[in-house]
Every structure is written in structure tokens, then in C-alpha cells.
Amino acid sequence: MPIGVPKVPFRSPGEEDASWVDVYNRLYRERLLFLGQGINSEISNQLIGLMVYLSIEDETKELYLFINSPGGWVIPGIAIYDTMQFVRPDVHTVCMGLAASMGSFILVGGEITKRLAFPHARVMMHQPASGYYEAQTGEFVLEAEELLKLRETLTRVYVQRTGKPLWVVSEDMEKDVFMSATEAQAYGIVDLVAVE
């Protein structure tokens, strides 16, 4: 039997009585954001909206994005990454569990020196994939060209944010590369590994 999202008390500044809000709403008010599912347009828009709203509310308080995601759609993932670069507060990224595919791309997009992985977290990077294998030839060629552009974008970002040479990142993106937290730190995807 599912229990749903737990409710916790929250007292707004200036109010005497606390109201009950879901735990994520309460955590958002503390600037703690969660990416705990596959990336699609809906979750991307929710996170973007929260980051922009919290940035407008107070541009001096940093944001924390906790990631446990198998990855997902490329364009919505890039939109999250771009928003992280756009908002004024620094965005800390924290990998707990798994940051795979676009999840690792978002993880590497945190403020440099403020990217963290839990000790048993896993990170996986690879090139973008397409789901259009039954398309007409003309559509497939256009899709392949777009995929190459996206791959170039992702590769460039990994190179800039990890400090790895282009040839290393390009070669690694040819396949699924899984890393432990310490391996992700050595690669430059995260800066710190939390202690056990």
C-alpha cells in the first residue's frame, strides 16, 4: 500500500500557526531540489521553474540539487543544465545513488568546487542515443545530424567542466562508462566525495 508523499509542518514567517505541506515543498523552501527520476519535459520544467523562482526570491542563497536519476531526454536535460548556469545563486550538485546519462551531465553542471557524490554513488556517462530507428531515410539523416550536434555540445561541456582533453571525453562517450564516486572525482565530474 503506497503511503504517498509525507506531510510535514511548516510555519511561514510572520504566521503563528503551522500548516501541513508535503515534504518536498518544505525542502524546496530550504532551497533543496531533487531530481529522483528519469528526465523528461515535465520534471525539467518543474526544476527550471523552481530554480528561477528561488533565484528571484533571493539571489544570494545557494541552491542544492540532489540527483538520483537514470538519465533521460537530452533536450530537457540540457535545459536544466543551462538554467543552472543562468541563475545567480551557485547550484551545488549532489549525486546520491545514480547519476547516469543526462543525470551525470547535470551533475557535472554544478558550480565547480561544489559538486559532491555520496561514497557509494555511481556515475555513468555516454553519448546521446536516438529512438527513431524506423524513420524514413530522410528523417533518419536529419536525426543523425542533430544527434551529432548534441553529442558535440555534451562533449564540449564535459571537456570544459572536467578539464579532461577532448580526445579522452570523446573516446569515453563512445560507450557506457560507469564510475564509482572516487573515480568520478578523479575524472572531474565531482569535486568531493562525502565521507562514510
Curated annotation (Swiss-Prot):
EC number: 3.4.21.92
GO biological process: protein quality control for misfolded or incompletely synthesized proteins
Superkingdom of the organism of origin: Eukaryota
InterPro entries, per the entry: ClpP, ClpP/crotonase-like_dom_sf, ClpP/TepA, ClpP_His_AS, ClpP_Ser_AS
Subcellular location, record wording: Plastid, Chloroplast stroma
GO molecular function, one term: serine-type endopeptidase activity
Top-level EC class as recorded in UniProt: hydrolase
Gene Ontology cellular-component annotations: chloroplast stroma; endopeptidase Clp complex
Family under the similarity heading: Belongs to the peptidase S14 family.
Job of this protein: Cleaves peptides in various proteins in a process that requires ATP hydrolysis. Has a chymotrypsin-like activity. Plays a major role in the degradation of misfolded proteins.
Protein name, entry field: ATP-dependent Clp protease proteolytic subunit
